[in-house]
Design a protein with these regions (language model features):
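N-terminal beta1-alpha1 cap of cysteine-dependent amidohydrolase-like domains
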Residues: 1-77, 81
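Structural detector of well-ordered beta-strand residues that form the stable sheet scaffold
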Residues: 3, 111-112
Length: 195
């Protein structure tokens, strides 16, 4: 099961739909994308509460930069928190986590939040249209995601409409140039793939 979210399991509808896939499961809370904060990310308590509300038997912090791919296989589910999608994708590739994440998406439950969701799709290139500076210190040239689904997403849609100049126009331009349809996800929304 693959669950792509804008800001986590933040609505009752998402919690209710996710519960059957998380009940009794041991979950890894992957902090890698939260560059500079990681285990101190302010959203960790909320994500932990949400996973436990879905019946998870336990939630443990996990960092691709510090732990092994084999370690991830010990979990039934994982939630990749938001942060820097360029850094997260680079870390997944550098440390060999692509295959364990693929396996988890088919044998267990894999949840992506914002950047954590973007890396699971075919491409993170849409971020270049809005915040390319996030790639400044990473220098990622290949924006190909893990392609665990065949859709691309645009998280935090309604929030970013007022934050970025010509946001919708730029999103449509990306769609035209790349021949894709972006699934616009507002906070509190999710895509369930494989349900």
């Amino acid at each position: 099961m693959l669950i792509l979210t804008s800001n986590g399991l933040t609505s009752q509808e998402i919690l209710d739909r996710a519960a059957p896939y998380l009940s009794g499961k041991r979950c890894a809370l992957v902090t890698t994308a939260s560059v500079g904060f990681k285990q101190n990310d302010k959203n960790i308590p909320r994500h932990t509460r949400e996973l436990l509300a879905c019946g998870a038997s336990g939630v443990e912090l996990f960092d691709f930069d510090e732990q092994s791919p084999a370690g991830l296989t010990a979990y039934d589910a994982a939630l990749l928190i938001g942060g820097n999608p360029y850094y997260l994708l680079h870390s997944i590739r550098t440390h060999g986590f692509a295959q364990p994440l693929r396996e988890l998406s088919t044998k267990g439950t894999l949840i992506g939040v914002s950047a954590g969701a973007l890396v699971l799709t075919p491409s993170i290139a849409v971020i270049d249209a809005f915040t390319p500076e996030m790639n400044q210190h990473v220098g990622l040239t290949d924006k190909t995601g893990l392609s665990l689904c065949d859709c691309e997403i645009l998280p935090h849609y309604s929030k970013f409409l007022t934050r970025f100049d010509r946001f919708e126009e730029r999103a449509q331009e990306y769609e035209r140039q790349n021949g894709v349809t972006l699934h616009r996800l507002n906070d509190g929304e999710a895509l369930f793939i494989g349900a």
